[in-house]
Amino acid sequence: MNYPKLPSFRLDGKRALVTGAGRGIGMGASIALAESGANVTLVSRTEKELKDLTDHINSQGFKASYQVLDVNNEDEVSSFINNAEPFDILINNAGTNRPAKLIDTKIEDFDYVMSLNVRSV
């Protein structure tokens, strides 16, 4: 079966920011944006993952940089925003979960999950 192909999707000259970029959906989105021509800034709490992904993207001839950042930390986020150049694209992908039944979840864990998944966006 033949499917129609979409025209080439280009983001040349655009600046993109991806939170939670170190793995999973964030990693995939970062690679796709870079392959489409965007200059991608990767954000996560884990420097090794960010460095490895940045090196991978740049080694393919695309543009990426990274910033270690906890999007749940207001001071870190404010500092980052105040020092960053404007972005054209924002992918708020940072998120987490605590694998437990809600009835068994500690309030501290619940608050952390809600803060990261809702407020950080």
Question: Which residues are covered by each model-predicted region?
Answer:
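Conserved catalytic-site loops of classical short-chain dehydrogenases/reductases
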Residues: 88-89, 111
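Conserved NAD(P)H cofactor-binding loop of Rossmann-fold oxidoreductase domains
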Residues: 94-98
